[in-house]
Amino acid sequence: MSWRSAFLLQARSDNATREAINAQRVEYCHQLHYLQMSSEKLAKGFLTPESSSEPPDLTHAAFVRCLQVMKGRPEIRRLLKFSDAKVFAHYIDSLLPFAEQVQRLAPSFAKEKGPNPEYPWRLTVADPVTAPVEFDFPQFDSRNAQMIKLLDLLRDLLQIVS
């Protein structure tokens, strides 16, 4: 199996886990954790050439770059059922700020300074420590139009990218 195929396979599994967790109403931090991981692995798989003998870089900053690359790929645009390149570019551009927020859910971005779905944090030494299971992550509300749009795109990309 190639690095590309392995990352795409794992991305699909991570997303299926996110969907299963969502159906069981487990704490939202776990859904967000799997969202961040599946989007990162999709990006790494997509950006890694099939012939690569080296794994992708060990970075969490891959999803936004992946979307930017996809924006210029006519075959991806067509598979996502967009006939107009400008409309597709606008669609992707409209998601980039939110995709950046999802990408920044990785604890390495948040460090001890802010909310992430994996590790407890506190903003200042005077603040209490917060566990992710007790935080509601309001910017990622599942009813948020950007969240819905991003989840739809992720689902579609996981189906079409090989």
What are these regions (language model features)?
Residues M1-M37, G45-T59:
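Charged alpha-helical initiation segments
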